[in-house]
Amino acid sequence: MKNIFFLFFAYLPLVMCSQQPETLKEKFADYFLIGATINQEDYQIIDKDEKILKIVSEDFSSVTPENSMKWMHSHPEYSKFTFSNAQKITDFAKDNDMYLLGHTLVWHNQVPDYVSKIEDKSKFNLHVKNHIFQLVTRFKGKVDMWDVVNEALNDDGTLRETVFLEMMGDNYIEKAFQYANDTDPNVELAYNDYNLYKPKKREGAIRIINSLKEKGIRIDAVGIQAHWDLHFPSIKEIEETIV
């Protein structure tokens, strides 16, 4: 499995100095990508804020739509897809030669109410399959990597109780990765979660990876969400998680 490292920053106002120092992406170009998220829904950054876009394009080498590709925004009604904001971010990323991380195809949060009202399990499965197909197809050749499944684990390493687990069974993760791979065998596919520095949760993620690999289902990367501060986790815990 390929090791791909990103360092992501949520946007914060920056004070520009008169000199032009080496940019962040130039400084770390030989080590890893420097990533930023763009929240188009709340701030309309692509439409309104050229200063922020200038900072993002000059200092960052990767971009992630914070909300635009999530189910609530991309597939708000049963038969309705809305890609306008996601497309704006995609165009910005490609125009600036940036790596684009698609986030996310299957997540228990920010899901429209209609999804949980689909009572027939076979129809639910087909709906998830179509959701993945539509998003991956729409951004095929543009998105470099998809977070296929996001935050499927509890901190004890067990699968989180979600509508996807209830309606598709405990192999719903395998199905999601297979659907994504079938739609675009060239895009990179990732599982993404937080608190993976905790041993039990990390073991759960490893079980997911091993299960996929044993069944011949492709997974290329694991996203480690860095919701950290100066006090935790320790450097040792971070290193153990990465290794």
Where are these regions (language model features)?
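Boundary/entry segment of secreted carbohydrate-active catalytic domains
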Residues: 19-62, 66
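Substrate-binding cleft and catalytic face of glycoside hydrolase catalytic domains
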Residues: 21-22, 58-76, 85-197
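Short, acidic/polar
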Residues: 42-59, 125-136, 201-212, 237-241
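Short, glycine/charged-enriched secondary-structure capping and boundary segments
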Residues: 50-51, 77-79, 115-117, 159-163, ...
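Glycoside hydrolase catalytic-domain groove-lining segments
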Residues: 91-99, 167-189, 202-243
